[in-house]
């Protein structure tokens, strides 16, 4: 399987880049499209559709290829996978029946392939991404191979989209179903944040709404451990969410990051980026330093050494929170990941990352870099 990545600031630039990269006889069959919500999605999809290319796409909080990181632009990974080795499924969930929709997708995938694996992207801030994962597990078991992310909208947190040929939705899912007998897909989710303090107990929560930890309002604890001062609704900013990160402990595998997204100032509770069950164990996180990047790259080196030594292409779902917290250093992380396999890469800064925790279960992650490695068998 051959892969090439292209990028551009407009549909016309994508048209030119596509023509240039197909000039040597390269005939891509699948495009992994990451683009700003400000871009003309219909025009970009028409260019690819007219070229006979199947589309898996999502809007982003920033996008990148090996050429560098951009905001407000378009990044595309072109693959010439045999069309018999994949199919694309697209569904909406207006009734919030997330689990049932992915159960249906899993059943459809089994009609096509005996051993399917999945590259997924979901849209809508109200989508229960964990329910999406559970739906696949219901049909295919706990070991199902899934990687992906949730769409963004340039940090507006209002409306994001997933897309395919002639379709896009702000409330749905797009899935590339791969034949795992023909295509090897491996993923590695790594965050690298260091824990601080003792293990604590969530004493009151409902879903993703955390009220108290060790019977103390959760905002008060995060102010303490984050070293914040004079925190008020007026001076609280998105960047403070970087401080409000908890490591949710799991019985099996690595912890899972949960970031604070919204504060309820009436009771100092916090709405988090995913479920935090009452009674669960958590630790707070230190603000990131440079070895966060080193840990992510080391995780990829271990993946290469132990599971997939060669690759045809890389896709990276990197949390938007990592971009906020690491700033320009994020380019070093992306470059370091690409250099492990030295193949074309494209990726997005996502609202959430969907992947198996290292030595653990499928999870919805936050502040995590989810590297997806593809290799034709």
State the predicted function of each range:
Residues 1-41, 45-51, 58-327, 331-343, ...:
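Small-residue-enriched flexible segments
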């Amino acid at each position: 399987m051959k892969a090439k990545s292209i990028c551009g600031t407009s549909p016309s630039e994508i048209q030119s880049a596509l023509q240039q990269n197909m000039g040597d006889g390269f005939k891509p069959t699948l495009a992994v499209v990451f683009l700003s919500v400000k871009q003309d999605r219909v025009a970009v999809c028409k260019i690819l559709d007219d070229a006979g290319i199947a589309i898996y796409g999502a809007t982003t909080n920033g996008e990148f290829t090996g050429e560098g990181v951009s905001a407000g632009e378009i990044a595309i990974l072109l693959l010439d996978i045999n069309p018999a080795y994949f199919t694309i499924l697209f569904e909406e969930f207006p009734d919030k029946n997330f689990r049932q929709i992915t159960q249906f997708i899993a059943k459809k995938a089994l009609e096509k392939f005996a051993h399917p694996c999945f590259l997924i992207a979901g849209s809508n801030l109200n989508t229960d991404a964990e329910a999406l994962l559970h739906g696949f597990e219901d049909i295919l078991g706990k070991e199902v191979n899934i990687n992906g992310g949730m769409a963004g909208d340039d940090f507006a947190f209002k409306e994001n989209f997933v897309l395919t040929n002639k379709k896009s939705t702000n409330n749905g899912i797009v899935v590339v179903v791969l034949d795992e007998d023909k295509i090897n897909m491996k993923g590695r989710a790594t965050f690298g944040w260091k824990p601080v303090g003792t293990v604590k107990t969530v004493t009151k929560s409902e879903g993703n709404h955390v009220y108290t930890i060790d019977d103390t309002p959760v905002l008060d604890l995060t102010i303490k451990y984050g070293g914040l001062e004079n925190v008020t609704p007026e001076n609280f900013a998105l960047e403070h969410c970087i401080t409000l990160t908890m490591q949710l402990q799991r019985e099996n595998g690595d912890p899972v990051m949960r970031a604070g997204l919204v504060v309820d100032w009436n009771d100092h509770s916090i709405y988090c980026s995913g479920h935090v069950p009452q009674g669960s164990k958590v630790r707070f996180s230190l603000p990131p330093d440079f070895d966060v990047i080193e840990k992510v790259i080391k995780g990829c080196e271990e993946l290469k050494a132990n599971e997939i030594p060669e690759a045809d292409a890389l896709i990276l779902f990197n949390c938007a929170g990592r971009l906020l917290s690491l700033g320009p250093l994020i380019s070093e992380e992306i470059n370091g990941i690409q250099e492990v396999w030295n193949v074309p890469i494209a990726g997005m800064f996502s609202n959430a990352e969907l992947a198996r925790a290292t030595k653990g279960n499928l999870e919805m992650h936050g502040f995590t870099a989810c590297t997806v490695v593809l290799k034709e068998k």
